[in-house]
């Protein structure tokens, strides 16, 4: 560890000790978060509506405040964007994280209060570096620059003083100036709206810089890496940036991309660290490089609740606090935060791998799964299966999506996968057969429905021509940033749209 990194790393040690206490004090820490959130918001319009002052504990909170979706809170958020204060949260909120919308809206605008910005998102970034340095005492992290690949922001159409953009852009815009000393590219470049021009500008401004860390979404960072290699004529990223040591990634599963990164960055010193930083808050980070699970961050002014996946959408689902969850079960996450979200259903599903400390994997989205035949196929099943089959066959998958395909009588059907390959497998039939068998190994419900083909026929694969998924994102105005391909869908909307592009 160089002198600068060693000196700065001393500042992280007190926080490392606090995180270690998560294993013993999780329940008390969580209830402290709830008490503080209720106290802070007791005089807001929302707090007065539900009489926060009289809430004595979790039982009262759970009984009094209904579960919320974006459609439920949208009228309040709109008023906040228009300059009203003391609505969902006491402070005036000038920044909003823009994310993919609901059935009724093209986009969601989620409040980014000063409190959640500092006490959740930036705290998560601080802790990520802290844990990374703790796990890698030979790091030279602060001796070189970090490249952050973010989105863009633009003034909200609702109010001149309210700004919106994808989360990464909001975070970059409000970043401590000291952090900018160790970050590239220039803020003006990273916040460019037009994706393809941005990639060119990033490459031109950074390829001669000493970069040792990357931060971003795996799929989009891969585009940038290939652009850097094309610019320099290099085979490996370490030829361009020899001090490269870590990629902080999130937004989508890293599994389908892991082998491609290892091929382009063939270094024993290269590390990969996953974070869970959503528009609604920073929720988890990978604290053990030997495990793919994430540590739930329980002291970020976020109170967590969980709905068993089979009860999502019910009028009165079971809702559990953190102390009541079980290992191995899929839950939809519900959050209460210093961003003014109260019992808010974010749409992500998680599965706990350990308790005390609470570790989990992101298993998917409440809307991104296939359960047309009772198979309950989740995104993490699909990602793992694709990754395993690629290793077995030597194939490389660039993007994929899957949806049910019903037979004429609708009593039977199959899953149709559309896959864009970076490298085709020797035999597509063998790839499909292996994928089908691997899904059965990973998911007992899928295996049961495939038994003797009673309700589910063998899956089929349609090969997408090069650029199909990129073009779909371009037409949707979703190039770059935190935009992602829907991996699984219970209907055929996405796959039909992709099919039309593929046929054109």
Regions found by a protein language model. Give the residues of each.
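Conserved AMP-binding loop of ANL adenylate-forming enzymes
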Residues: 131-177
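Short, solvent-exposed loop/turn and secondary-structure capping segments
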Residues: 110-111, 159, 226
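Conserved structural elements of the adenylate-forming
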Residues: 112-134
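Accessory carbohydrate-recognition regions in carbohydrate-active enzymes
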Residues: 37, 56-57, 69, 114-121
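Conserved adenylation A10 loop of the ANL superfamily
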Residues: 96-110, 461
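Conserved pre-ATP/AMP-binding loop-to-beta segment of ANL
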Residues: 81-98
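Active-site glycine/GP-rich loop and adjacent strand/helix microenvironment
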Residues: 1-53, 61-68, 76-83, 168-504
């Amino acid at each position: 560890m160089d002198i600068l990194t060693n000196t700065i790393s001393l500042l992280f040690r007190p926080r490392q000790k606090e995180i270690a206490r998560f294993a013993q004090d999780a329940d008390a820490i969580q209830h402290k978060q709830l008490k503080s959130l209720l106290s802070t918001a007791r005089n807001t319009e929302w707090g007065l509506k539900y009489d926060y002052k009289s809430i004595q504990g979790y039982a009262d909170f759970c009984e009094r405040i209904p579960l919320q979706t974006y459609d439920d809170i949208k009228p309040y958020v709109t008023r906040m964007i228009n300059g009203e204060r003391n609505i969902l949260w006491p402070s005036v909120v000038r920044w909003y994280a823009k994310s993919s919308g609901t059935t009724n809206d093209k986009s969601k605008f989620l409040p980014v209060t000063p409190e959640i910005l500092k006490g959740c998102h930036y705290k998560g970034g601080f802790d990520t570096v802290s844990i990374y340095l703790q796990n890698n005492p030979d790091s030279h992290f602060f001796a070189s620059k970090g490249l952050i690949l973010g989105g863009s922001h633009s003034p909200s159409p609702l109010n001149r003083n309210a700004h919106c953009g994808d989360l990464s852009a909001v975070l970059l815009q409000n970043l401590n100036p000291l952090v900018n000393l160790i970050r590239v590219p220039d803020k003006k470049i990273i916040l460019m709206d037009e994706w393809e021009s941005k990639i060119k500008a990033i490459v031109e401004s950074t390829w001669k810089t000493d970069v040792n860390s990357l931060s971003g979404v795996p799929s989009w960072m891969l585009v940038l890496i290939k652009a850097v290699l094309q610019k320099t004529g290099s085979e490996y990223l370490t030829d361009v940036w020899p001090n490269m040591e870590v990629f902080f990634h999130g937004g989508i599963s890293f599994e389908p991309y892991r082998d491609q990164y290892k091929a382009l960055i063939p270094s024993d010193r290269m590390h990969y660290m996953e974070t869970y930083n959503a528009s609604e808050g920073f929720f988890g980070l990978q604290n053990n490089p030997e495990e793919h699970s994430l540590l739930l961050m329980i002291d970020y002014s976020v109170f967590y609740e969980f709905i068993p996946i089979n009860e999502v959408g019910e009028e009165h689902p079971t809702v559990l606090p953190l102390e009541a969850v079980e290992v191995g079960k899929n839950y939809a996450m519900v959050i209460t935060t210093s961003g003014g979200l109260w019992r808010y259903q974010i749409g992500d599903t998680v599965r706990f791998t350990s308790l005390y400390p609470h570790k989990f994997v992101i298993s998917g989205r409440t809307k991104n799964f296939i359960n047309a035949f009772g198979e309950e196929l989740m995104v993490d099943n699909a990602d793992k299966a694709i990754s395993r089959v690629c290793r077995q066959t030597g194939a490389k998958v660039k993007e994929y999506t899957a949806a049910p395909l019903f037979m004429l009588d609708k009593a039977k059907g199959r899953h149709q996968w559309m896959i864009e390959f970076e490298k085709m497998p020797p035999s597509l039939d063998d790839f499909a057969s292996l994928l089908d068998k691997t899904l059965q190994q990973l998911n007992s419900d899928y295996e049961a429905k495939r038994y003797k083909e009673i309700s589910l026929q063998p899956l089929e694969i349609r090969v997408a021509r090069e650029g199909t998924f990129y073009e779909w994102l371009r037409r949707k105005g979703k190039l770059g940033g935190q935009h992602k391909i829907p991996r699984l869908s219970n209907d055929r909307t996405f796959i039909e749209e992709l099919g039309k592009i593929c046929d054109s």
